[in-house]
Design a protein with these regions (language model features):
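A conserved structural/catalytic subdomain of Rossmann-like adenosyl-cofactor enzymes
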Residues: 1-204
Length: 205
């Protein structure tokens, strides 16, 4: 849980409380660990800034995004990453045995950097799609400004989900069957490579 205490509330925020439900806004680290990235934490804080009328702080965050991204969008970052992955596979496939590990490491470093850029673009898009250039609004499933009367009607519950509601499920644009086919193809390729490697190892005995 995140708590933001406001000792100097604006008059229009008297007897009101901002609730943010960030349960569905996180980055998966592994099967048992989720976390907020730096950009995600700053986005959550930006919602608080807008609630408090601190639009200059929201604008400062947008400027930070734009300095990092320039003209890069989610679409262009994804296209660049996909192109790099294709080129990396070709480079690794054509590399000599001696150079393969070095090229794999170089390609991975490039892909990691592109992944970071793509994630930054996604967080910028997430923020601006909801709040544009800096105007607070209640967002279903994410945030809501509730009055003391509304809180009283809910028996003074301080659970954000009781106020923000449930957002509609978003279509991530990924075709499940197509993705499963890709995974099976990748597993088949890895299995074939493992068999070849095992054959080479056995030859040395």
């Amino acid at each position: 849980s995140l708590w933001f205490f406001d000792k100097n509330k604006r008059a229009e925020n008297r007897d009101k409380v901002l609730f943010i439900d960030a349960r569905n806004y996180y980055t998966v680290v592994d099967r048992t660990l989720n976390e907020w990235t730096e950009w995600q934490l700053r986005n959550l804080q930006a919602i608080v800034h807008l609630y408090r009328g601190e639009t200059e702080k929201y604008q400062a965050l947008l400027n930070d995004y734009r300095q990092v991204l320039g003209d890069i969008t989610v679409a262009s970052a994804q296209a660049t990453l996909d192109k790099q992955k294709t080129e990396a596979k070709e480079a690794i496939a054509n590399a000599s045995r001696k150079d393969k590990k070095r090229i794999e490491a170089e390609m991975k470093a490039i892909e990691d950097a592109l992944e970071d850029t793509l994630e930054t673009a996604r967080q910028y898009e997430w923020l601006t799609e909801k709040f544009g250039e800096g105007e607070y609004k209640d967002v279903l499933g994410l945030c809501k400004i509730a009055t003391i009367q509304e809180i009283e009607e809910k028996n003074y519950s301080l659970t954000p989900g009781a106020y923000v509601g449930v957002a509609e499920a978003e279509d991530d644009g990924v075709d499940f069957h197509e993705r499963m086919s890709e995974i099976h193809a990748e597993l088949k390729r890895l299995n074939e490579e493992a068999n070849v490697l095992m054959g080479e190892i056995l030859k040395g005995w």
